[in-house]
């Protein structure tokens, strides 16, 4: 039997990949989204969740960034 899934290959640094693996393991998006963990910098994910992933990554980047006016 053959299973077909539409996916997207994501290339990222190892730190971001760990964040994606964390989101997948904790079911933060409501379901598992990683189809295949390929290597240290590549992950194959379900295509329909790419926009949600981009939002989560954006939130993470906003939390880790600071402006020059902050002390």
Curated annotation (Swiss-Prot):
UniProt cross-references to InterPro entries, sorted A to Z: TFB5-like_sf, TFIIH_TTDA/Tfb5
One GO process term, biological-process aspect: maturation of SSU-rRNA from tricistronic rRNA transcript (SSU-rRNA, 5.8S rRNA, LSU-rRNA)
Modified residues (Phosphothreonine): 69
Cellular location(s): Nucleus; Cytoplasm
Keywords: Cytoplasm, Disease variant, DNA damage, DNA repair, Ichthyosis, Nucleus, Phosphoprotein, Transcription, Transcription regulation
GO cellular component: cytoplasm; nucleolus; nucleoplasm; transcription factor TFIID complex; transcription factor TFIIH core complex; transcription factor TFIIH holo complex
Superkingdom, taxonomy of origin: Eukaryota
Coiled coil: none
Family assignment from sequence similarity: Belongs to the TFB5 family.
Disease tied to this entry: Trichothiodystrophy 3, photosensitive: A form of trichothiodystrophy, an autosomal recessive disease characterized by sulfur-deficient brittle hair and multisystem variable abnormalities. The spectrum of clinical features varies from mild disease with only hair involvement to severe disease with cutaneous, neurologic and profound developmental defects. Ichthyosis, intellectual and developmental disabilities, decreased fertility, abnormal characteristics at birth, ocular abnormalities, short stature, and infections are common manifestations.
PANTHER family attached to this UniProt entry: GENERAL TRANSCRIPTION FACTOR IIH SUBUNIT 5
Record note on quaternary structure: Component of the 7-subunit TFIIH core complex composed of XPB/ERCC3, XPD/ERCC2, GTF2H1, GTF2H2, GTF2H3, GTF2H4 and GTF2H5, which is active in NER. The core complex associates with the 3-subunit CDK-activating kinase (CAK) module composed of CCNH/cyclin H, CDK7 and MNAT1 to form the 10-subunit holoenzyme (holo-TFIIH) active in transcription.
Functional summary from the UniProt entry: Component of the general transcription and DNA repair factor IIH (TFIIH) core complex, which is involved in general and transcription-coupled nucleotide excision repair (NER) of damaged DNA and, when complexed to CAK, in RNA transcription by RNA polymerase II. In NER, TFIIH acts by opening DNA around the lesion to allow the excision of the damaged oligonucleotide and its replacement by a new DNA fragment. In transcription, TFIIH has an essential role in transcription initiation.
The protein's name in its UniProt record: General transcription factor IIH subunit 5
Species of provenance: Homo sapiens
